[in-house]
Amino acid sequence: MSGADLERRRLLAALAAGSAGACLGGGLSAPAVLAQDAGTGPSLGAPLADDLAARPARWYRKLEGLRVECGLCPRRCRVADLERGACGVRENRAGEYFTLVHSRPCSLHLDPIEKKPFYHVLPGTSSLSLATVGCNLECRFCQNWEIAQARPEQVPGFDLPPDRVAALAGKYGAPTIACTYTEPVVWAEYAIDVAVAGRAAGLRTLLVSNGYIEREPLDDLIAVLGAVKVDLKAFTDGFYRDQCRGERK
């Protein structure tokens, strides 16, 4: 039996047993094998704000008085200095906007691709699936609310840059990487960089999203993605307003 087959059997055994190397937010657990391979593993203490994975954000414009306007989603948050947007993962620092979750996923799994769900994209294969904290909606029925509505300080995360994500997918024979579980729109910079690294390694990157995004970042994402699944929550504006605190656009 090859080393790759042994690694795969170890991983499947860990998944079947419900083994968890670290509990990362709301019961979403990384299997022991993946947790070990992720490198440094989860940082178990709640980090200080200065320790977060701050990277320059894209898709914003500067306003007067050190304020910025985010152009990532239709909320168009206007954010004062040292404040954050509604998603909680993007922060204004002296008139410069930053994402606080780049290369810091809080959930990491090897899932059947049908779980995303994608039924006509490489059926029968596995997808390395990851998420950071954060979302730009507040759905009352969200099954992953513990991480979707959390702030970066509240949930431990892995130090996992895009090239390591691609390497892990390759190691476990996953032909795809899925940005899922929370809302990849609010960590779009990381998702794009993961997709670029994945493409260089011959992998496709998938996005599972609520679709609440502006045109420019949408175009930037689509340019590097292999497939997108949009979760339409309902068909009425009232439902989006009352149950998701957002808009159907």
Go through each PLM region and give its residues.
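N-terminal secretory signal peptides and thylakoid transit peptides that target proteins
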Residues: 1-19
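C-terminal segment of classical bacterial N-terminal signal peptides
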Residues: 24-31
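Short, surface-exposed beta-strand/loop patches at domain edges
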Residues: 31-32, 208
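N-terminal [4Fe-4S]-dependent radical SAM core
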Residues: 42-69, 74-131, 146
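Extended interfacial segments that mediate partner engagement and assembly in macromolecular machines
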Residues: 99-180, 185, 191
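Conserved AdoMet/S-adenosylmethionine-binding subsite of the radical SAM
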Residues: 159-249
